[in-house]
Curated annotation (Swiss-Prot):
<feature type="modified residue" description="N6-lipoyllysine">
    <location>
        <position position="65"/>
    </location>
</feature>
<dbReference type="InterPro" id="IPR003016">
    <property type="entry name" value="2-oxoA_DH_lipoyl-BS"/>
</dbReference>
<dbReference type="InterPro" id="IPR000089">
    <property type="entry name" value="Biotin_lipoyl"/>
</dbReference>
<dbReference type="GO" id="GO:0005737">
    <property type="term" value="C:cytoplasm"/>
</dbReference>
<feature type="domain" description="Lipoyl-binding">
    <location>
        <begin position="24"/>
        <end position="106"/>
    </location>
</feature>
<dbReference type="Pfam" id="PF01597">
    <property type="entry name" value="GCV_H"/>
</dbReference>
<dbReference type="InterPro" id="IPR017453">
    <property type="entry name" value="GCV_H_sub"/>
</dbReference>
<comment type="function">
    <text>The glycine cleavage system catalyzes the degradation of glycine. The H protein shuttles the methylamine group of glycine from the P protein to the T protein.</text>
</comment>
<dbReference type="GO" id="GO:0019464">
    <property type="term" value="P:glycine decarboxylation via glycine cleavage system"/>
</dbReference>
<comment type="subunit">
    <text>The glycine cleavage system is composed of four proteins: P, T, L and H.</text>
</comment>
<dbReference type="InterPro" id="IPR033753">
    <property type="entry name" value="GCV_H/Fam206"/>
</dbReference>
<dbReference type="InterPro" id="IPR011053">
    <property type="entry name" value="Single_hybrid_motif"/>
</dbReference>
<keyword id="KW-0450">Lipoyl</keyword>
<dbReference type="InterPro" id="IPR002930">
    <property type="entry name" value="GCV_H"/>
</dbReference>
<comment type="similarity">
    <text>Belongs to the GcvH family.</text>
</comment>
<protein>
    <recommendedName>
        <fullName>Probable glycine cleavage system H protein</fullName>
    </recommendedName>
</protein>
<dbReference type="GO" id="GO:0005960">
    <property type="term" value="C:glycine cleavage complex"/>
</dbReference>
Amino acid sequence: MSFDVPADRRYLESHEWAQPDDDVVRVGITDFAQDELGDIVFVELPSVGDRIEHEAEFGVIESIKAVSDLYAPVSGEVVAVNDDLEDAPELVNDDPFGDGWLLEVEADGDDYESLLTADEYEAQIA
């Protein structure tokens, strides 16, 4: 099976993605991760103003099959969360790289550079 792995972002081995836009980094889970989890029924995210740390747990995603921790690809302050997921968690399944994004972080540091490239992540899930 083939999964989308957009080249315009970087990846954690735990299947989260990061897409920078200046100092703000948008975060979500990969197409591979949403497929493995199955139908997403609940997403627990931090609040705006909370701080998250690179590779530390920042939330939980729940499907009909499993509950999984979410890990931060970058460190920084949460500046936005995707409130649409509260009423429509299935957006993560439908569009994991678009409408199903999880949160945005004002990154402080160079964690992004240490993440896997699209090619490296693709090799991991092959």
